[in-house]
Amino acid sequence: MAALSNVRWLTRAVLGARNSGAWRGLRTAASAQAASQSQAQDVRVEGAFPVTMLPGDGVGPELMHAVKEVFKAAAVPVEFKEHHLSEVQNMASEEKLEQVLSSMKENKVAIIGKIYTPMEYKGELASYDMQLRRKLDLFANVVHVKSLPGYKTRHNNLDLVIIREQTEGEYSSLEHESARGVIECLKIVTRTKSQRIAKFAFDYATKKGRSKVTAVHKANIMKLGDGLFLQCCEEVAELYPKIKFETMIIDNCCMQLVQNPYQFDVLVMPNLYGNIIDNLAAGLVGGAGVVPGESYSAEYAVFETGARHPFAQAVGRNIANPTAMLLSASNMLRHLNLEYHSSMIADAVKKVIKVGKVRTRDMGGYSTTTDFIKSVIGHLHPHGG
């Protein structure tokens, strides 16, 4: 029960403290076929763990198909409860949103693709993925940026964790036109949520054997908002004398990540900064296709890719890299205390990459998504006995 209890321990501790044109192609027959194929192959296992699946937009349905194929081959005792929610495929409504929320609340665990948000203003400022985070209070986004053996990038042997507060900050959806041609966007920072994410970061570092936490901010300019966030991090840091604590301004952090990312261990930051740093750091180890991510509340766990990109231009072309989603699915199994299957799948993915014979285009190869899935399945083997 160690893996499952780790996350639950963290959450208990926490309680203590856009171009729309490309998206019209999503309504093509290829996209519909991928979604249909994915839905038709639901895993049905007696006594299995129920998990909500939300394929999302872009290549999401294709990535979920990869997860299902690998889970089937590995005989993973998980039953997917699939729902489709999209703001670009006429598959969004308050009723569908409530159905998704109901499923996630019932199952407690979900695996999701990116729900693309059109840049046009259509009356609702809060996107569906933002509403899901808020309604489920998925306050902590965790992205583990780690180099993959056998896949050389500009920086190798990286191992750092980005923890992002994702229920307030700049993504408050509080915008209005105060005068013609003048838009005001409100950034919300609260002591309660700043302390909560800081405590989550230090608890995470403690449980995972990490030695340092760096708070990323812009308090030199936003003296009250980011100043409060920084103050909360400093106060929480005093409760963890064995964990080294540092602070860094966001612009300097971006430069330092490119020049010397090895100085970082665990980074904690507000919403917008985390969104930017997640993507920057993913680029250091190979891009959006190889970095897994997860989001937590006190009750729920959601698994996804670390860099949230729908990759619309790849829809139906069989070129998407399923590495990040498969690794995220492996993390989900560890959360469910299915260590045997989690290790089997993660090791198979890493072996495929280390051997280097099967790589998708984003990794410099010519293999298709299907090729990668078949290779992973071919590398599955019994674990722990």
From Swiss-Prot:
Protein keywords: Acetylation, Mitochondrion, Transit peptide, Tricarboxylic acid cycle
Coiled coil regions, renumbered to chain: none
A Pfam entry, by short name: Iso_dh
Regulation: The heterotetramer and the heterodimer composed of IDH3A and IDH3G subunits can be allosterically activated by citrate (CIT) or/and ADP, and the two activators can act independently or synergistically. The heterodimer composed of IDH3A and IDH3B subunits cannot be allosterically regulated and the allosteric regulation of the heterotetramer is through the IDH3G subunit and not the IDH3B subunit.
Cellular localisation: Mitochondrion
Gene Ontology CC, one term: isocitrate dehydrogenase complex (NAD+)
Superkingdom of the source species: Eukaryota
Keyword DNA-binding (UniProt): no
PTM-bearing positions, type N6-acetyllysine: K199
TM region(s), chain numbering: none
GO molecular function, one term: NAD binding
Gene3D superfamilies attached to this UniProt entry: Isopropylmalate Dehydrogenase
Gene Ontology annotations of biological process type: isocitrate metabolic process; tricarboxylic acid cycle
Transit peptide residues according to the UniProt entry: 1-34
Task of the protein: Plays a structural role to facilitate the assembly and ensure the full activity of the enzyme catalyzing the decarboxylation of isocitrate (ICT) into alpha-ketoglutarate. The heterodimer composed of the alpha (IDH3A) and beta (IDH3B) subunits and the heterodimer composed of the alpha (IDH3A) and gamma (IDH3G) subunits, have considerable basal activity but the full activity of the heterotetramer (containing two subunits of IDH3A, one of IDH3B and one of IDH3G) requires the assembly and cooperative function of both heterodimers.
Family under the similarity heading: Belongs to the isocitrate and isopropylmalate dehydrogenases family.
Subunit structure: Heterooligomer of subunits alpha (IDH3A), beta (IDH3B), and gamma (IDH3G) in the apparent ratio of 2:1:1. The heterodimer containing one IDH3A and one IDH3B subunit and the heterodimer containing one IDH3A and one IDH3G subunit assemble into a heterotetramer (which contains two subunits of IDH3A, one of IDH3B and one of IDH3G) and further into the heterooctamer.
Protein name: Isocitrate dehydrogenase [NAD] subunit beta, mitochondrial
Lineage, top ranks: Eukaryota, Metazoa, Chordata, Craniata, Vertebrata
